[in-house]
Amino acid sequence: MAMSMALGAAVQNERIAAKAEAFLEEQTAVLRLQKEQMQEESDLHRWSLRIRHFSDVMKVAFELSVAFIVVALAAGIGAAIWNAAHDKGVVIEAFSVPPDMAAKGLTGEVVATKLLDRLAALQAQTVSNRAASSYANNWGNDIKVQIPDTGVSIGELNRYLRGWLGHETRISGEIYHTDSGLSVTARAGSDTSPTFQGKEGELDKLIQQAAEAVYRSTQPYRYAVYLDGHNRAAEAKTIYGQLLVNGSREDRAWAYIGLDNQSLARGDFAGGTAELRRSIAIEPNLLLAYENLANNEGAMQHDEQQLAATKQAIAIGESGGDAGMEPANLPVRVLQDKAQLASSLGDFGAEIDFDRKIEQLPDRNSLENAYEGDIGACGVLHDAGCVQATREALPPSSDSLVTIGRTANLELADLFLEHWQAARDEGSSIPPLIRSLGPQADVFLRRSEYPFLAFIAANLSDFKNAHALIDKTPADCVVCLRLRGRIDAMQHRWPASEYWFRRAVALAPSVPFGETDWGQMLLMKGDFDAAIEKLTRAHAKGPHFADPLEMWGEALMRKNRSDLALAEFAEANRYAPNWGRLHLKWGETLLYSGHPDEAKKQFARAAQLELSAKDRVELKKVWTG
């Protein structure tokens, strides 16, 4: 209001107007200064807010950093405590050595390192399927030399925690001069240890002896396995005996496995089997015990017992129930067991499939067995092309055991392909190789080789030699009894043949082979109904075994029931599609049942496949293609 009045008066009076103008200029200047001050205050406030925000951020970051450091420190301490509590390794302390040796560079740390090298070598040379976790005192590959620290350090803290919470094995020792040379002692923990003495130049030998003493003290089962592998069976047996008295339950069960291996080396398969049954009584889920039992029974040609042990091994392996098996070996072992089961029941196509899977896995002493199994299985499938392809794919080997295995399986394949002269040539080279095995030779000759050599001789009409060989075979050998029956059948000695087959089936009632052979004998005799009855039983036990189906079809055809025989031949073809005789007889059945065009297809297929000389003559009679 006052400003308005002054401005109104200024209009009437020039002097007043001049004063008013001066007043307005002063007010404008004041307002401009106030505006500038307010702008500066605003800028200062914004800068202050930025500083406060940055300060808050830095405060939070600092607090987070502190928290992170605390968490990391706690985690590190926790990890150190956990590692210490689970430490089962070996720590080798620097040895006490004479000053003159140290002056030459053989310090306590150098000697400790030499001992470490020897222990690592012993471990590497010990081949066992046993899992490290099953040892009461396992240090595996965790072996290290302790280098002393000065002052307080993280290393000292870790050592303190491991000593307080862990289960590590500490090895100490000393070397000193004697009148005759040197004396070396190495001890694990508080255990006493022998002292080894020798000449000045025998230090490496003395350290090796000390390392073995430590290995025996800390890893007795592994050391026994090492000894067995280095032709020191008597020393190994002593350790196994000590484990049976003082060892853990796992050690006792595995000690019996070690004793089984020693029994086999002496050729005592029955004794080895008894050791394995003792192992199983202690540890019923010990997979390797059942697998070794199956192998022992197989070597003895105890088909029924082998089948039972193999089934039990598969059940344990598939359930993962054996913590004692080295985990890396388990997948291969399960496949091997399944291949064995398939073979025991006549499912040779499945056996080859399992072998192929094994061949795709890392070699755990498993590839050669798979290769050899393929050869035999291809032969039993009457598939000459499969045998040849498998044989050509074999990698070269100079190992005598590999030579025996491959030659024996080629002999078996040629036997089923009816290549009698080739089988005899292969078979004649096997006995000298087997005899080189030492005490085991007698078992393999009388139970695995003589029966097949006898059957080959019979098919070459050398019955005198056939009987001389087969008479050397034992009465509890199932394949021996079966081949006795087949040799007698070839001479039309029907009652004697039936006697042997009856005994074979009684010893192995769950496998299909005895009744298959029995049915074949009855087919040769012309008793078709009885043959069909035996072959039906064989098929029930081995539903994927082609031989009883093919013979069943032949029996029906010879009974003038070609209409029924067709189904048997078709089913047999599912399991042995490259069997020349099968396609020949299938074609004959089609021809007799009024299907000449279909018969020609089977005859043409037979002509492409392996046929015996007799079957090839028969093919020419029925087909002129």
Predicted regions and their residues:
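Register position in tetratricopeptide repeats
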Residues: G229, A265, A299, S344, ...
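Start-of-helix register in tetratricopeptide repeats
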Residues: T218, W254, L288, E326, ...
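Residue-level recognition of tetratricopeptide repeat
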Residues: V225, N261, N295, Q340, ...
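Single-residue signature of alpha-solenoid repeat helices
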Residues: A236, G272, Q306, E351, ...
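Short beta-strand->alpha-helix linker/helix-N-cap micro-motif
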Residues: A85-G181, G189
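C-terminal/domain-edge helix-coil "capping" segments
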Residues: A2-A79, D179-S180, R187-A274
